Amino acid sequence: MNDRCSALKDAAARLEAAGCSDARLDAEWMLAEAAGLSRLSLLLDLDAPLSDQEAARFSAYLARRAAGDPLQYVLGHTDFMGHEFRCDARALIPRGDTEPLCEAVIERAGALKTPSVLELGAGSGAVSVSVKLACPGAAVTAA
């Protein structure tokens, strides 16, 4: 792995062989994280060399992803409702298909004078945190 382009090709092939359905995309996200870049910045400069530290981080991420760890756990974070949340195996990964529910709660809470929101079965807390960020005056409890 001398440059980013070669690293991505090798990683995508390894992930495909491991049964990863989004092999190329996952490789891009992991390499961007390893290099401390946005995915867009990475893609705009694929000919750049990898430092030894970047290559080591990328290799560690790749091993975990090839072993079946979810990408969000490998990266240690995920996006939900426009916010970044830390993420690991202690809680379920906040999912994009939960965002419409969260948006409905925010809309409903915004229409109330003194809203109270209770999230039962909170895992990561991403729903409650997102509601509180959107409705700072709401009393939000996660249990």
Could you say what each language-model-derived stretch is?
Residues 1-43, 48-50:
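Non-catalytic accessory regions of SAM-dependent methyltransferases
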Residues 8, 27-28, 58, 71, ...:
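A general structural signal for well-ordered alpha-helical segments in protein cores
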Residues 16-19, 35, 66, 109-113:
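Secondary-structure transition/hinge residues
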Residues 19, 23, 38-39, 70, ...:
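Secondary-structure boundary/capping signal
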Residues 29-107:
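Conserved AdoMet
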Residues 96-143:
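Conserved SAM/SAH cofactor-binding pocket of Class I
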